[in-house]
Amino acid sequence: MEGFSPPINTAQVDAKTKLDEKVDYSNLPCPVLYEELNREATMALKPELFEGFRLDYNKSLNQKFFLSHSILMGPTEVPNPTPSSEIIKIPTANYDFGAGFIDPKLYLIGRITTDGRLNARAKFDLTDNFSVKANALLTDEEDKSQGHLVIDYKGSDYRTQLQLGNNSVYAANYIQHVTPHLSLGGEAFWLGQQLMSGVGYAARYETDKTVASGQIASTGVAVMNYVHKVSEKLSFATDFIYNYLSRDVTASVGYDLITRQSRLRGKVDSNGVVAAYLEEQLPIGLRFLLSAEVDHVKKDYKFGFGVNAF
């Protein structure tokens, strides 16, 4: 009839909208580093747990230079000389001193401990796309010193790395966005000391609310992670690790809760391990830390508390 228009088919409108929203494959985003594919799950499921008392003090001397002091007092696990599965711990205390220089194109960070360990890291951005990173660990223990060099190149929608280490360690990886949400990558490595080589493959899918990633390597390990962001303050994470050579399986689930003055992370895994980590911001320039881990199978219990001053 005149004056009436035909009803609108919403399905046809949605289909037309999707066709109109064509993907510009020449303008895809740059992916995360290959080694950081699981960073969201790692942050939620693997906080820096500790046992005993920990005190950290960081002092900025100017906008680029800072000093740090750290004290850790608590038990340390040592190998059991008997066939018993009992865990042996001895009381220890350790202090480390650190210094750092941070610039938009260069950072240098070094730490030395009372047990004779020197840890140094450096990164230099040669251009906006090309950077070099170096890590070194020096110790008086035989065959424990390490050196690692990473050359990183970042393209518009891809990243690639070349890694060189002592003991004839060579590795290379490449990752690229193939759609606005999906990135695919692979790696190859050679371990000269173990006379072992291998390859690996990875995929990562991310949206505003979810991140899913998976990796598999010829060494026999497959890893899958999923993180769901419920709100700006709360997210849940889970991971699944399977070694198809030894048939070992580990699964874990956890959460990450961020409030105005605190952050609480916790997890439980299929090995019977329950852990929690709390960071509480105090109004006087201090951060209070609580760390707890319970291994019901091994009957191992760890508790720690600390203070971070800045």
From Swiss-Prot:
Any one cellular component term from GO for this entry? mitochondrial outer membrane
Chief localization: mitochondrion
Q: Which UniProt keywords apply?
A: Acetylation, Ion transport, Membrane, Mitochondrion, Mitochondrion outer membrane, Porin, Protein transport, Transmembrane, Transmembrane beta strand, Transport
Describe, from its UniProt entry, the tissues in which this protein is expressed: Expressed in roots, flowers, young cotyledons and leaves.
**Assembly:** Forms part of the preprotein translocase complex of the outer mitochondrial membrane (TOM complex) which consists of at least 6 different proteins (TOM5, TOM6, TOM7, TOM20, TOM22/TOM9 and TOM40). Present in a large lipid-enriched complex called mitochondrial transmembrane lipoprotein (MTL) complex made of proteins located in the two mitochondrial membranes, including the TOM complex and the core components of the MICOS complex and containing at least digalactosyldiacylglycerol (DGDG). Binds to MIC60.
Covalent S-S links between cysteines:
none
Q: How does this protein sit in the membrane?
A: Multi-pass membrane protein
Q: What does this protein do?
A: Central component of the receptor complex responsible for the recognition and translocation of cytosolically synthesized mitochondrial preproteins. Together with TOM22 functions as the transit peptide receptor at the surface of the mitochondrion outer membrane and facilitates the movement of preproteins into the translocation pore. Directly involved in the pore formation.
Q: Which family does it belong to?
A: Belongs to the Tom40 family.
Q: Gene3D superfamilies, from UniProt?
A: Porin
Q: Could you state a single Gene Ontology molecular function term?
A: protein transmembrane transporter activity
Q: Name one GO biological process term.
A: monoatomic ion transport
- This protein's gene is called TOM40-2
Cellular compartments annotated = Mitochondrion outer membrane
Mention any Pfam family matching this sequence. Answer: Porin_3
PTM N-acetylmethionine: at which residues? M1
| Inducers of expression | Up-regulated after antimycin A or rotenone treatments.
Q: What is the name attached to this protein's record?
A: Probable mitochondrial import receptor subunit TOM40-2
